């Protein structure tokens, strides 16, 4: 490929800095899985001002197979009304409900995903997607906007209706 060793090292350093590669002293450099603590929340970087690393928790609310709404079909590059899987979960940090998560998956790729399999899974979802379905999430495009808390946020996050929240739309 006619690339200098220094250029390759610099590229590896940059990939390691972004947690796309992991270095293990005495063993080498590896592509991490989503089950490794350092990359478990690769696309979610929430750290309190004091730097404390909170204990995380995940509660599955439900999992359904549905026809893709137009907006979801467009994001996932599917035909309108294609089958999708929607997983709803609540993420907590130090016992505090923090994130109400809607995860949309192409139904054809994730055929074995249903409420029973999601609830039976005890590994991080992205790690499960890698191991069980051969789908690695290595990149994400995000759009963030301010929204007023609606009924589901009020119910699951325990915030007053209308409270300003951040909504993150991520395609990974």
PLM segments and residue spans:
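Generic short beta-strand segments
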Residues: 63-68, 88-90, 147, 169-171
